[in-house]
Amino acid sequence: MNHSSIEVANKQGFAYAIGAALLFSCKPIIIKWAYSYGIDALSLMLLRMILALPVYLLIGTIIIRKRNIKLPAKHWLSAAFVGLFGYYLATLLDLKGLELANAQLERIILYAYPTLVVVLGAIIFKHKVTKQQIGALVLCYAGIICIFLQDLSLQGKQVIEGSLLILLSALSYAIYMLFSKKHIDRLGSLLFTCISMTSATFATIIHTSIALSYGELNPNEWVLSNELMAIVLLLTFAATIVPSFMISEAVSRIGAANAALTGTVGPIMTSIMAVALLGEIFTLHHGIGMVLVILGVSRLKPKTIPEQKQPEKKQTAEGSQ
């Protein structure tokens, strides 16, 4: 692959990452709409996963048959295990946190995960942290902290609990991002995403079954109306299926750290939608925080990514059709 081809792949990777961030930024807004109909976090997660499962199973089956993939069981199990961090544990903690915190705060805290990806990568894999990354992170998270402290002073103790849950969600997602690269290189981004979402769905089904058996979940407390079903469908396709494939494609091109850093634009879009659609408060602190985040993102420039292998290129082209 020549230099121009690498630059094209690099730009495509950042485009996928930004697109995924924008779609993911809609997620807390949609979830808040769903909560207004009385549904709980685990039930919402189950509906979302079950609706998405057929899509991932279909795409995964097509890829396996077309590429005639034959790998040891340990590779499949390892990919499924990593997927649990990104699409089961991180999602569950995030949904639980959103029951207590508002949409703007959720998106701000969740975007601590780029820092965690960079730090964990440096500690575990000895990845180099550039001065540009450090400077960008300082600006971004100065803005994040500014907004966080403002919301914390306005809403009280429940925000603390919600924030902790969402912070744990960010940590779980950072682990997923960090360990997903080798599986994407081995399986391809689309197939790995299918495996991850499938394993997360079955984990959610098991969790729900246990919760029902212990009386911790009462489905009679909410009604699956046409309006709620429409919201769940929107959450499933616009804020789950499409961005999950896009972020995997981004990681396969530019790596976990760069994909994570680019996604920092998410809080800005969430704040705009939260104010416009949910009526959340937007103060001077929020404005200052958003400016700092924008300045931080502006310092992030694409890095030259390693040359891609030809099989992965073919698989990526199939996924873009």
Q: Where does each model-flagged region fall?
A:
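Glycine-/small-residue-enriched transmembrane alpha-helix faces in small-molecule transporters
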Residues: 1-47, 155-182, 202, 206, ...
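Hydrophobic alpha-helical transmembrane segments of multi-pass integral membrane proteins
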Residues: 11-15, 42-62, 81, 132, ...
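Helix-helix packing/entry segments at the starts of transmembrane helices
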Residues: 21, 47, 105-112, 177-202, ...
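Specific transmembrane alpha-helical segments of multi-pass solute transporters/efflux pumps
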Residues: 23, 28, 57-110, 146, ...
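Hydrophobic/small/kink-forming positions within alpha-helical transmembrane segments
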Residues: 25, 83-88, 92, 115-119, ...
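Membrane-interface helix termini and inter-helical loops of multi-pass transporters
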Residues: 29-37, 98-99, 148-159, 211-227, ...
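Specific alpha-helical transmembrane segments that line the substrate/conduction pathway
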Residues: 43-54, 91-128, 133-134, 169, ...
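Hydrophobic transmembrane alpha-helices of multi-pass small-molecule transport proteins
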Residues: 56, 120, 129-151, 264, ...
